[in-house]
Amino acid sequence: VIPHQLADTDGDGRTDTLLFQSNFRPGTARDFWILNDSSLKAAPSADVCFSRLVPERLDDFAWENDLTAHRIYGPAVARPAPEGEGLVSSGTDVWSKRAGAPVINEFYKRGDYHRDHGRGLDMYNVGPGRGCGGIAVFRDGKPHASGNWASARALYNGPVQTAFEVVYAPWDIGGGVRVAETRRVALDAGSRFSKVRSTLTIRGAETVKAGVGMDTGKGRNDYETVTKDREDGGLMTAWSRPRKNDGCLGTAVIVPWGPEGGAVDSEGCTYWIREAANGKPFEWYMGAVWDKASPFKSSAAWEAEARRVRECVRHPLRVRVR
């Protein structure tokens, strides 16, 4: 019996998907049987993949699995002090965590997560940029990013996958055009990459130039290496040392579609650009690694891992139900 979970992936309140994991070599096939559970041992049921709203910390929304953890910012933190922190950002934060142990509830309960007490820490600097991944809409060569998310809901947690959805309220990009984003994020057990599906609601135009980007400038995280590759879908990786004694962070964004032109650098971030139509979703991936808690100890090793993941995205499994 392998870890598995039943999930409501479309949010209608009814279970519609069976999720499970297995490893495959290229060109191989495997058979799986769905049997009556009365004669089987129970599969592990721990919520390895977990996401939740964090109202006790100014409306953060956080998610994690056994390898990585992230958070994004809600409306409360955007309020001026003392009610909030005045942080307006739709970028993604990275938490450096040691593999295996969940940290979200522990970090927030402790409150002191900017120092490593043995489980990891938050040393990444997001600021108003895209962080480890985010959207901006370009007009006249300038990026226009949303504010903090306006609403958020966890969809499901479990041993195989967690998923949630956030909505970014309409923002002006100029020329009488307003854009809103609905973002659905899923993270699998054993993966350092979250899968993101963004759907833009556009008013005042039929299409816009959407940029999927991440932080790459020197100002926030002291990046040592940044790579960009648009072959077979856009890929960018970065390797940084935000603090002198806490190791290095690798971040990456993968887009499984052909970007328009080369990567665009603007305001400390790098973007892959595509045309986006009203109501038509597009997918992208964001990931991160901490060298003190992974086999990836260099920028080259992290870039190679990101390229491997891109190959997996480009060549998905084919499933047949008999």
What label would you give each PLM region?
Residues S38-P143:
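Solvent-exposed N-terminal domain segments of exported/luminal and surface proteins
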